[in-house]
């Protein structure tokens, strides 16, 4: 876990974000953020987005509509402060007070084969999203010793 925490620290530093939570993909980062926020209103997404985004909305039973608009680098899931920044790799590029989701898929600038991260602004967001990444478990203690209260 030491390597993961160091990776999170370096990604947060690169983007100048207070915190970064490592995930297994940008899609799962977005899903965790949607579960965390549980928006009730219809979410607006660009018509030309990656197919996993509307599939995630369907999976979570969240209403969404497509908007035919151009975007570059990143876009907001309108109605939330969640940002799909899967193709955005910019030093100092964190948008304050957002949950900014990154991708490290094999065709991205930082190509790790697979992976993602959530940039966030508070310790509370970091702590909860980190636990959600591990199915409600903390990463610093054996699961048998934990009182799991959060669902990932």
How should each PLM-predicted stretch be described?
Residues 5-43, 53-59, 66:
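Phosphate-binding glycine-rich loop
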Residues 18, 40-41, 79, 98, ...:
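Short coil/turn segments at beta-strand junctions that form active-site/ligand-binding loops
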